[in-house]
């Protein structure tokens, strides 16, 4: 980054500091990952200069012959990965992908059935502070009070009672497999559309390690980062019958020109996801998550639903007599990055919470293995149990440093 260093020392310094943070800390935020250098090169390419309103072959600007190739590559690779009939790779985020689906099939005030945010849903699944909860009449379903797994009988009962036009499946903090076939059966029974937000599990689906929602849903949305290990962005997969409507909802509906440099980076990441070693990577994510969950339970920590089927683990910290906010802060102090998170049947404020959400996608990208999960579980428990003991926290910092030093990353940067 010689040019940046000469041009803008302040921004260069901030980026260098962030690189240092990523290298020196254990990244356990479930929605984060480390992209390849190839993905970063594509995102930092000259494609950032190109305006390309419209779609390949139907642009509102000239000079789009090369970016058309890139967007077609991205779309074709997604179709190959997930078996989708139609793909739109232009959404700038998962939230905008969800918005586009809503704008395609809903009118203001329509009833939608979505997962309660504190039970594992997402802001765009009907939270009253989000456009989705403001524009539409969302009815919430949640998890069982004992198992903390989705109660499909409750979903069916609420669907029959409220007759939603759309049912939203998918989550941002749900550690178990979701039965998309069952959701489609419920949707069909009440005459509703089904949209699946697979943002967190897309990489696992791509590797064939989680049920694929595409055969069951009218619409599937996802981010392109998280377990899919691409750049930050979104996309929509849908049945061919909705293709023109979805494309129109994205452009000119809610977006202008697509970010072609990001779409190029998406294409590269999708190419990586088609390789055999990506399947190995995704399996290692799950193996690491299971090992980490087992280690945390051995240390006496409570896990929502008792474990995990995917990359994500939700820790209930109430038995440690601390809050999620305190847990996030003290873990960050020793070099372990997590996020505080609400848990099912939460009583604390979302700014405080009773839980911590962690995931294994990023550490697996870095090369961490099963024995490293044992050490991370020990570190998390040791830190939380000794959160007011500075000597213990200093010991934890040294252990984190020893662990991260074994896995150098982005050495060419």
UniProtKB/Swiss-Prot annotation:
Catalytic activity: (6R)-5,10-methylene-5,6,7,8-tetrahydrofolate + glycine + H2O = (6S)-5,6,7,8-tetrahydrofolate + L-serine
Listed GO biological process terms: glycine biosynthetic process from serine; tetrahydrofolate interconversion
Cofactor needs: pyridoxal 5'-phosphate
Pfam families linked to this entry: SHMT
Keyword Amino-acid biosynthesis: yes
Main location: cytoplasm
EC number: 2.1.2.1
GO cellular component terms listed in the entry, alphabetical order: cytosol
PTM sites of type N6-(pyridoxal phosphate)lysine: 226
Binding positions for (6S)-5,6,7,8-tetrahydrofolate per the UniProt entry: 117, 121-123, 239, 349-351
Top class in the EC scheme: transferase
GO MF annotation terms: glycine hydroxymethyltransferase activity; pyridoxal phosphate binding
Keyword NAD listed: no
Domain of life of the organism encoding this protein: Bacteria
Disulfide bonding pattern of the chain: none
The entry's keywords: Amino-acid biosynthesis, Cytoplasm, One-carbon metabolism, Pyridoxal phosphate, Transferase
Location within or outside the cell: Cytoplasm
UniProt pathway annotation: One-carbon metabolism; tetrahydrofolate interconversion; Amino-acid biosynthesis; glycine biosynthesis; glycine from L-serine: step 1/1
PROSITE patterns: SHMT
Site positions for Plays an important role in substrate specificity: 225
Complex and partners: Homodimer.
Stated role: Catalyzes the reversible interconversion of serine and glycine with tetrahydrofolate (THF) serving as the one-carbon carrier. This reaction serves as the major source of one-carbon groups required for the biosynthesis of purines, thymidylate, methionine, and other important biomolecules. Also exhibits THF-independent aldolase activity toward beta-hydroxyamino acids, producing glycine and aldehydes, via a retro-aldol mechanism.
Protein name: Serine hydroxymethyltransferase
Source organism: Bacillus anthracis
């Amino acid at each position: 980054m010689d040019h940046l260093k000469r041009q803008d020392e302040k921004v260069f310094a901030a980026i260098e500091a962030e690189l240092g943070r990523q290298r020196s800390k254990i990244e356990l935020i479930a929605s984060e990952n480390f992209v390849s250098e190839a993905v970063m090169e594509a995102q930092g390419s000259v494609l950032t200069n190109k305006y390309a309103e419209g779609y390949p072959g139907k642009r509102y600007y000239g000079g789009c012959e090369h970016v058309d190739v890139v967007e077609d590559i991205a779309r074709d690779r997604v179709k190959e990965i997930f078996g989708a009939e139609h793909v739109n790779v232009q959404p700038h985020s998962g939230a905008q992908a969800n918005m586009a689906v809503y704008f395609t099939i809903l009118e203001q005030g329509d009833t939608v059935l979505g997962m309660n945010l504190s039970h594992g849903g997402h802001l765009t699944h009907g939270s009253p502070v989000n456009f989705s909860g403001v524009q539409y009449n969302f009815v919430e379903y949640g998890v069982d009070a004992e198992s903390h797994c989705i109660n499909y009988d409750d979903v069916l009962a609420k669907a029959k009672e409220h007759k939603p036009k759309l049912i939203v499946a998918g989550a941002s903090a749900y550690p178990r497999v979701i039965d998309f076939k069952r959701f489609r059966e419920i949707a069909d029974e009440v005459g509703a559309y089904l949209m699946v937000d697979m943002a967190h599990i897309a990489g696992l689906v791509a590797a064939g390690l989680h049920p694929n929602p595409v055969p069951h849903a009218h619409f599937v949305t996802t981010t392109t980062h998280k377990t899919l290990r691409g750049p930050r962005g979104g996309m929509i997969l849908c049945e061919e019958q909705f293709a023109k409507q979805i494309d129109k909802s994205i452009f000119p509906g809610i977006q202008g020109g697509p970010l072609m440099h990001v779409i190029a980076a998406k294409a590269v990441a999708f190419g990586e996801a088609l390789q055999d070693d990506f399947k190995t990577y995704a399996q290692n994510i799950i193996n690491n998550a299971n090992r980490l969950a087992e280690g945390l339970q051995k240390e006496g920590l409570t896990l929502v639903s008792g474990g995990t089927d995917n990359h994500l683990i939700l820790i209930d910290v109430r038995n440690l007599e601390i809050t999620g906010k305190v847990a996030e802060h003290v873990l960050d102090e020793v070099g372990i990055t997590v996020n505080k998170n609400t848990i099912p049947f939460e009583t604390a404020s979302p700014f405080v919470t009773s839980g911590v959400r962690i995931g294994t996608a990023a550490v697996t990208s870095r090369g961490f293995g099963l024995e490293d999960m044992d050490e991370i579980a020990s570190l998390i428990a040791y830190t939380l149990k000794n959160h007011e003991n500075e000597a213990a926290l200093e010991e934890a910092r040294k252990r984190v440093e020893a662990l991260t030093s074994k896995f150098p990353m982005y050495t060419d940067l």
